[in-house]
UniProtKB/Swiss-Prot annotation:
InterPro entries: SGS3 (IPR044287), XS_domain (IPR005380), XS_domain_sf (IPR038588), Znf-XS_domain (IPR005381). It comes from Oryza sativa subsp. japonica. GO terms for biological process: defense response to virus; regulation of defense response to virus; regulatory ncRNA-mediated gene silencing. Transmembrane segments: none annotated. This is Protein SUPPRESSOR OF GENE SILENCING 3 homolog. The gene is SGS3. Residues 10-24 have a biased composition (Gly residues).
């Protein structure tokens, strides 16, 4: 498609027959919108439901395919030279449509290609879409109002892409070409999508090759219209579009998909005929001819026996053999009967193919140049799959039960369907085998894991038993030691108590002795006054002693009470400390058990099949 500024004289391409001059004629130029408006949002949304769909270019159905420019026109009535086969014109036009056209060589312009290229200061392109910013407005730079997007853009990009799209482009790596600044953002979006998302027909795309030019705001629903646009673009930025088509096709091929969505049907091809079924003899049989040997004395023909015929073709697993007999004996016609199954038919067909490969099949047997005897006198056997006519010929002289029973059945029903069923059964069998193998592996793994865990548990229990026994021994030792210490201190306390009691007894004796001395000193000698004074003195001494004894007993009671209180306090402190020790031991044992607690065995789920 060409823009309004590139309309060609006569309304058709040069060389098409519509324009006698075949040159270029500039009719008019239209003012292009600012690049900011054209490319605004181009890379922001890749799937806009409100965007208008891309216009599809109509295809010509006249049998000739026209390239843009001065390309040749191939008519459908052109015939190839004798002896040189060529594809039909329709196929050639399809190939030409799917292939990138060659570079178009047009007539030179009057002033050459010296068009004014707009200059922009460096760094004025945005990072997201590569669009010019406010400092580089196409309307202000192009004061005359000409549309330079079709001409200058191609001219500018020809220099920019000269290193990427020249004759050496095929030698560049795919990644290098894909990372070009024009396509990098587009392919980054592609890589972020899954295959299902790529094939969504409702996903809309902008053409990265049309960036900053006509068609930049067009939407293409799905990758197929975008690929068609890139392959058929024939007037502006051809190299860029062909490169995009090549890269997109390679990228989709590496992702394992194509631009044609799965399930889309064009119905433009002729396939096989609707039915390929045929009737076959059932059970499968192979007719073996020339099995006659010689005539006996009664002029009756003798021939090969049943087992001998089976032995001759033992590689093909025939189940039975029968021979045809007539009034003159053996008729030289025999059949090998195979199992009534698809495998039996495949064996019969394999034997038939063997006869065909060594040219001893039906056609050779029916020809006038068949060889019945080989050098040395041996007879050459011929064979082929049995047909209804063959079976009727075989049963010509047979009546009643001697007739070889057969029936005509559908090939698809008896062979194809059974083979498909066998294939499905085989797949199911393989699936079940793999599942069983996985289950056995899983069971083996569980068994090994259980064995390891059981062994570790057994070892742990043995270690715990040893530790427990050692702890009991230590506990007994500690109890024995504590008992010894307790007895020792009890003995010491008893000694102290006995010493105290002895001291009290001595103290009481001393008091009694002193009192007795005082009483003995009371004699009747002396005057009455002296006796009275002595009695008073003795009485005072006794009273003082009694008073002193009472004070002693009171203080003794206080000391004993204080001692008992201290003992109670000490016992409380001891019990509290003992309780703290037991609590610390319990905490330490709990922490130790948590540390050495065995892992909980969890049986893994059945492996996914």
């Amino acid at each position: 498609m060409a823009s309004a500024g590139d309309r060609r004289g006569g309304g058709g391409p040069p060389g098409s027959g519509d324009d006698s001059g075949g040159g270029w004629e500039t009719v008019e130029k239209r003012v292009k919108k600012p690049a900011q408006q054209v490319g605004k949002g181009q890379w922001g949304q890749w799937n806009s439901p409100n965007a208008a769909p891309a216009p599809t270019a109509p295809r010509s159905g006249s049998g000739a395919f026209h390239h843009s420019g001065n390309t040749l026109v191939r008519h459908s009535d052109r015939r190839p030279a004798r002896g040189t086969p060529r594809p039909p014109p329709q196929n050639r036009s399809i190939e030409a449509e799917l292939q990138a056209p060659h570079g178009v060589v047009t007539a030179p312009l009057a002033n050459g290609w010296q068009w004014g290229a707009r200059s922009c200061p460096p760094g004025t392109e945005s990072k997201e879409g590569g669009l010019p910013l406010s400092g580089c407005d196409p309307e202000t730079d192009n004061a005359e109002g000409y549309d330079t997007s079709d001409d200058d853009n191609d001219d500018d990009m020809s220099d920019d892409l000269s290193d990427d799209y020249d004759s050496d482009a095929s030698e560049k790596s795919f990644e290098t070409r894909k990372n070009h600044k024009l396509f990098k953002g587009f392919f980054e979006v592609l890589e972020a999508l899954s295959v299902e998302q790529l094939n969504e027909p409702t996903r809309q795309w902008h053409c990265p090759a049309c960036k900053n030019g006509p068609g930049a705001i067009d939407w293409y629903k799905g990758l197929q219209p975008l690929m068609t646009h890139a392959k058929t673009k024939g007037s502006i930025k051809v190299k860029r579009h062909r490169e995009l088509a090549s890269l997109l096709e390679e990228e989709l091929s590496r992702r394992g998909t194509s631009v044609v969505p799965s399930g889309e049907q064009f119905r433009k091809w002729k396939g096989l005929r609707e039915s390929t079924d045929r009737e076959i003899v059932w059970p499968p049989m192979v007719v073996v001819m020339n099995t006659v040997l010689e005539q006996d004395e009664d002029d009756k023909w003798k021939g090969m026996g049943n087992q001998e015929l089976i032995d001759y073709f033992s590689e093909y697993a025939a189940s039975k053999a029968r021979h045809a007999y007539g009034p003159n004996g053996h008729r030289g016609m025999s059949v090998l009967i195979f199992d009534s199954s698809a495998v039996g038919y495949m064996e019969a067909e394999r034997l038939h193919d063997h006869f065909v490969r060594q040219r001893t099949d039906r056609n050779t047997w029916n020809s006038a140049h068949k060889v019945t005897f080989l050098p040395g006198g041996k007879r050459q056997l011929y064979g082929f799959l049995a047909t209804k006519d063959d079976m009727e010929t075989f049963n010509r002289h047979c009546h009643g039960k001697s007739r070889l029973k057969y029936e005509m059945r559908s090939y698809n029903e008896m062979v194809v369907t059974q083979m498909k069923q066998m294939s499905e059964d085989n797949q199911q069998l393989n699936y079940l085998k793999n599942k069983m193998v996985k289950k056995e592996q899983h069971s083996k793994l569980v068994e090994d894991t259980l064995s390891v865990v059981t062994q570790k548990l057994r070892e742990t229990m043995e270690e715990n038993t040893i530790v427990r026994n050692k702890a009991k021994e230590k506990h007994l030792e500690y109890e024995k030691e504590m008992k010894y210490q307790e007895e020792f201190f009890h003995d010491q306390i008893e000694k102290i108590h006995k010493a105290t009691e002895e001291k009290e007894i001595k103290f009481e004796k001393l008091l009694q002795e002193e009192r007795a001395k005082a009483r003995q000193s009371d004699v009747d000698s002396g005057s009455t006054e002296d006796r009275r004074q002595r009695k008073e003195k003795i009485q005072n001494f006794i009273d003082c002693q009694v008073k002193d004894v009472e004070e002693f007993e009171a203080e003794r009671d206080k000391l004993i009470k204080l001692h008992e209180e201290k003992k109670v306090k000490l016992k409380k402190e001891y019990l509290a400390k003992e309780f703290e020790l037991e609590k610390e031991l319990d905490t330490a044992l709990t922490s130790l058990m948590d540390k050495h607690k065995p892992d909980i065995f969890k049986s893994s789920t059945s492996p996914s099949t």
